[in-house]
Regions:
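Asp-based, Mg2+/Mn2+-dependent phosphohydrolase catalytic module
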Residues: 1-6, 18-19, 110, 114, ...
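Active-site neighborhood of HAD-like aspartate-dependent phosphohydrolases
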Residues: 1-47
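Alpha-helix N-cap/helix-initiation sites
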Residues: 17, 21-22, 38-42, 63-67, ...
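Hydrophobic alpha-helical core bundles mediating ligand binding, dimerization, or RNAP-core interactions
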Residues: 21-32, 48-52, 70, 74, ...
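Alpha-helical elements of Rossmann-like donor-binding domains used by nucleotide-donor carbohydrate transfer enzymes
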Residues: 23, 27, 47, 73-76, ...
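Short helix-capping segments at alpha-helix termini
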Residues: 33-39, 80-85, 142-146, 174-175
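A metal-dependent, Asp-based hydrolase signature
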Residues: 46, 50-94
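Short, acidic loop-to-helix structural element flanking the phosphoryl-transfer center
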Residues: 63, 67-68, 86-87, 94-125, ...
Length: 234
C-alpha cells in the first residue's frame, strides 16, 4: 500500500534541543541555588538524571500529570538537601519551559516536510510533553504552520509508546496505520511504539543516542534521508 502519511517526533527529530540542554540546566541549577543551601551541583545533576526514568514511566503510563512529574523528580533529586517549596517549583518549571524559546528546527526540517507534503503526503507531529510547552516549541521553530496534524500527549491523555497515542494521532492526521510511517529519536517511544501500533514503517534518527536497531526499522542520520528510506521520490 502506498504511504499516505508520516508522523514525526518533535524534540531532537524535527527540532534541535541539543544546544539548549546545558543552558537550561544552568538556569535550573541557579534557581535551586537561590532556594536551597549547600548544593553540590555535580551531585545534584547526577541525581536529577538518575531519577528521571522512574518518574517518566509513571508519566508515560498516564498515572501522573506533568506538574506532578516535575514536582516528584525535583523532590527526589533534592532530597539530600531539603524539601521543594511551591515558589521553587514554580521557578523550576519556568526555567524548564524557557527551553521552548531556544528551539530551532534542524536545517533540513522545513524543506523535508514541504517536499513530502508537495507529493501529497500528510505530515504530522506526535510528541510527548505538556501542551503549552510543546506548542510553544512549534511556534518558535516555525514548524507549526507546516504540519497537517499536531498530537501532544497531554492533549491526547496518553503518551507514546502506548498504541492509543498513535491511534489518536492517526485520527488527527486522517490516515490509517498501514499507510503511515513514524520517524523519531527514541527506540522505545517512536520505534517500538510505532511497530507496536502497526504502522507501515518506522525510522530511527538516533542523533546522540545509542542502541540497536530492531528488525523492520530503518536508520536515518538526517531528515533529508527519510523520504528515500521510505521509498518516496521527493
Amino acid at each position: 500500500m502506498r504511504l499516505r502519511g508520516i508522523l514525526f517526533d518533535l524534540d531532537d527529530t524535527l527540532a534541535d534541543s541539543s544546544g539548549t540542554e546545558e543552558v537550561v540546566w544552568e538556569r535550573v541549577a541557579d534557581v535551586i541555588d537561590e532556594h536551597v543551601d549547600g548544593i553540590d551541583r555535580s551531585e545534584l545533576r547526577r541525581r536529577y538524571l538518575d531519577v528521571l526514568e522512574g518518574h517518566y514511566s509513571e508519566l508515560a503510563a498516564g498515572r501522573i500529570d506533568f506538574v506532578t512529574f516535575r514536582r516528584r523528580r525535583l523532590a527526589d533529586a533534592l532530597s539530600p538537601w531539603g524539601e521543594v517549596s511551591e515558589e521553587l517549583l514554580e521557578r523550576y518549571i519556568a526555567a524548564k519551559e524557557a527551553i521552548a524559546d531556544e528551539m530551532r528546527p534542524f536545517p533540513d526540517a522545513v524543506a523535508t516536510v514541504r517536499a513530502l507534503r508537495g507529493e501529497g503526503i500528510r505530515v504530522g507531529v506526535l510528541t510527548n510533553g505538556p501542551s503549552r510547552f510543546q506548542r510553544r516549541k512549534l511556534e518558535v521553530s516555525g514548524l507549526g504552520p507546516e504540519l497537517d496534524a499536531i498530537a501532544i500527549s497531554e492533549e491526547l491523555g496518553v503518551a507514546k509508546p502506548d498504541p492509543e497515542a498513535f491511534e489518536q494521532a492517526l485520527a488527527l492526521l486522517g490516515t490509517r496505520a498501514e499507510e503511515t510511517a513514524m520517524v523519531g529519536d527514541s527506540l522505545e517511544n517512536d520505534v517500538a511504539g510505532g511497530l507496536g501500533a502497526g504502522l507501515a514503517a518506522v525510522v530511527w534518527m538516533p542523533g546522540r543516542r545509542e542502541g540497536e536497531l530492531p528488525p523492520g526499522a530503518h536508520l536515518a542520520r538526517e531528515l533529508a534521508e527519510v523520504p528515500r528510506l521510505l521509498g518516496l521520490a521527493v
